Every structure is written in C-alpha cells, then in structure tokens.
Amino acid sequence: MLGVLVFSFLDLYGFEKENITLRGSFDNSRIAIENKGKATVAFMGGSITEMDGYRPMLMDFLAKRYPECQFTFINAGISSTCSTTGAFRLPRDVLSQGPVDLFFIEFAVNDDQDAAHSQDACIRGMEGIIRQIRRKSPHTDVVATYFVNPKMLAELDNGKKPLSMSSHEQVLEKYQVSRIHLARELSAQIKKNKFTWEKFGGTHPKPPGNRLCADMHEHLLSLAWSGPSPSLAKPHPFPTNPLSPYNYEHGRFLSPQKINLTEGWKYSEPDWPNLKGGKRKRYLDAPLLHTDMEDKPIHFKFEGRAIGAFVLAGPDAGTIKFQIDGKIDGEVNLHHNYSRNLHYPRTVMFAHDLQPGTHSITILSKPSSQGNAVRIMEFCIN
C-alpha cells in the first residue's frame, strides 16, 4: 500500500519517484509538533543552508502548517564547510541546544568543490554526523539533500554518480535516512525542458531553485505525516557496525585557549586590518591561535584517535608540520584555491586512524610559497 501511495503521490506533483526517498518514519517529529506543541528543527550545511534559500522556505511551511506549534529553528549553515567540519562542530552548533526533532543536512556540494574529499573522507564525515545524532538525540528525524554544482550536474547528465553523493548515499541507506535528490531531479527537469540551470540559479540557487527544493521536502513530509497520528516516539536504528571504523562519531572541538602557549604563538585576534585578503564577519572580533614565525613548536595532549584543525587559510597561509607521539611525522599545506583572496575556513586532518587513547602532538609553521601564517580557530578531536 505504501508503495502505491508513494507512486501516486509523486506522479501527482511531477517529480521523478526515485528522487524523493522516504526511509523509516517521521513519527517522532510529528509527535513533537502535533502532540507536544513544541519542536526544534535544525539545518546544517554550507552556504546553501546558511543563506536565505530553501531553509526559510521550509521554516515558513512548518510554521503555517502547524500554527499552534512553538518552533525553535537552528541555522547551523556555515559557508565553505564540509561534512568533516560538520562532524566536529555538530556538538557546538546543534546538539548543545538540546534534543532535535527534525534535522536537515546538506554537504554534497562542499564535500566536492570545497574539500575535494575522497570516498572514505565523505563517509567519515557524514557517518560521524549521523552516528552522533543517533547516539545523542536518537529520536531525531533526519532528511539529507543533494544540491549540485555544474561539474556534478554534468556527471549526472552523463549517467554518472558524483562521488560525494554516492558516498553519502551509502551512509543514508545504512542508517535509513530519508533523502531528497534535488540534483537528479533538476537534471531530469532540464532534459524535459521544464527547468534550466539559469532559472535554477546555479550552485547557490535563486528563488525558483530553492522553491523546487522546498517543494520536494514539503511533499516528503506531507507523505510521511499523512497517516493516523502516532502516540509513541521510538528511537531510530543505530547499527553497532559502522561503515568506517574511523568515522567521526565522537567528533568535537578543542579550544586552543586550553593549550599552553609557547614562544612565537599567540591566542588573540589577528591584526585583520593589515592582512591582505577578504574576511568574513563571523570570524572577526574573536581570538584564535596564530603564528607567523616558522619553526616555533607548540605541544599538547589529546584523547581520541583523530586530530586536526579548523583553520582560516588566507593568502599568506603556510604549512603545518606535525609530529604525533614522537614517531608519526607529516605536514599539511593550509593554502587552498579559495585562499588567494579570502581567509578561507577549512578543516585539515593530521591523523584519523590512531589507536584510541591519549596522544601528544607537536605542531609548527613551515613556510610555503605563499607565506608562513597559521591561524587555528579550533582543534578537531575524535
């Protein structure tokens, strides 16, 4: 019966049936909205989520459909961030505000064009987010959305599956997370001459593109909430065997403020007015750990099996040289393609597959062709 309902519902609104995938149920969020009259709805992703796009459209849909419900909406979108950063900032930006009833997430585009993640990295990030949600807020109903950029759209048009989408899909299938394949729907509608890339608005959609996305979500939720009202909330499945043993399920930030400073390092606001490159407002007026002196080491200990840093990498970004436990050596060039004219936020990982336990790390700045500046907003621990 459900299959028939899905087909007729999707045919009615003209969407390709495989592009709106309902997995599991949305009974828990419905109970919070209809029975309790109070619900928390969080949106996580990059600039597509942060901007006034599909997110406020869905907020408006929920508020109008349920005027008696007191909604708390969380905008956890941060431009340029990928699923790796998402896994480490989830406790701060979302879970710190208490249980979440409905959670929307998108990282397909940024895992592709910003982070250029491998399949393993895409899985570590997305699975880490889903497992954290399932462990700390087990009744949360989740929807993932695949937005699209020109390269990914061309891949779909040629019958290929973009790497970030196929990687995320493995996670969504395993944890029975519902999915909106906006990218594939757009490709299909363009082929039918119902839409154009220009009308959609590009990687950061214009109102028509965001309306298409919001409509798909509204239809999914309307379908999920169409039966008799449930009375008992149930936790979602939480498999004990993850896809990746190195996923960031225990991802969290460690403030550099807790690190003992050594010569050459400061925990303060950089001298932004005298630094070349664009600066985003959210990162100003806040202290961070920084140095522009090469070969000045700083040391600290951490508990976990992964260590990295959430940094601002500008035109003068250098290279971090590191040593873990006195035996694992490496270096990471902080400079990114987007760093040429912007102090660009990105997460770099030093190690993700250590043995669980206490470790020590030493880091220092090594000059690169662009400069030798290191600016760390948070350390990333898993």
Regions found by a protein language model. Give the residues of each.
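Membrane/wall-proximal cationic-aromatic binding patches
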Residues: 15-43, 48, 62
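Alpha-helical cap/lid subdomain in secreted, periplasmic
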Residues: 56-72, 81, 85-234, 254, ...
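Surface-exposed aromatic
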Residues: 75
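C-terminal interaction-tip segments
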Residues: 381-382
